[in-house]
């Protein structure tokens, strides 16, 4: 199964739509959003209607928490975890948060195969103990190119996708 990891969308609807179209064409089965989607209306109008699989989300630092949770309840495939989430997909334990400090703590715990995070808008990967710590960058393209990551559970391969190169 292929899993897309995105973060820091910051209401950039055109980039989100392009990424979602690519995900559909490339059989992405699940999506993890590491925060800063921003406007709750983006969840209801763009993200949830245009992604067929499960969507796992956490808060960033610029969301309307109450309204975002309310919108998420309208979509059975959307699970909002609050500030930190964890799931297991194809035998891989994954945690996801927005802030790098919390992500490093989770990675150091040794409980996860992957910890995903956002906030810095910079793609990054490192290994702490046996945990791969990954920042997919910013889908909005703020301060760097618009990027997201894809993890393939069948091949154990993680790739950074640069949005402008996919079009």
Question: Can you name each region flagged by the protein language model?
Answer:
Residues 1, 45-46, 62, 70-73, ...:
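Generic ordered-secondary-structure signal
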Residues 167:
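Conserved histidine-centered catalytic loops in small-molecule metabolism enzymes
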Residues 54-56, 93-95, 99-163:
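Conserved beta-sheet core of the metallophosphoesterase superfamily
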Residues 2-89:
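Core catalytic region of metal-dependent phosphoesterases/phosphodiesterases
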């Amino acid at each position: 199964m292929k899993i897309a990891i995105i973060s820091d969308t910051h209401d950039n609807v055109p980039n989100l739509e392009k990424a979602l179209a690519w995900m559909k064409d490339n059989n992405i089965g699940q999506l993890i959003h590491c925060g800063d989607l921003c406007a709750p209306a983006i969840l209801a109008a763009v993200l949830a209607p245009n992604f067929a699989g499960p969507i796992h989300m956490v808060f960033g630092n610029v969301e309307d928490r109450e309204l975002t949770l309310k919108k998420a309840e309208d979509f059975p495939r959307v699970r909002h975890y609050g500030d930190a989430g964890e799931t297991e997909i194809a035998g891989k334990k994954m945690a996801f948060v927005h802030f790098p400090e919390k992500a490093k703590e989770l990675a150091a715990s040794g409980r996860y195969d992957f910890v995903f995070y956002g906030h810095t808008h910079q793609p990054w990967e490192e290994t702490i103990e046996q945990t791969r710590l990954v920042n997919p960058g910013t889908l909005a393209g703020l301060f760097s190119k618009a990027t997201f990551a894809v993890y393939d559970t069948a091949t154990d391969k993680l790739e950074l996708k640069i949005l402008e190169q996919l079009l």
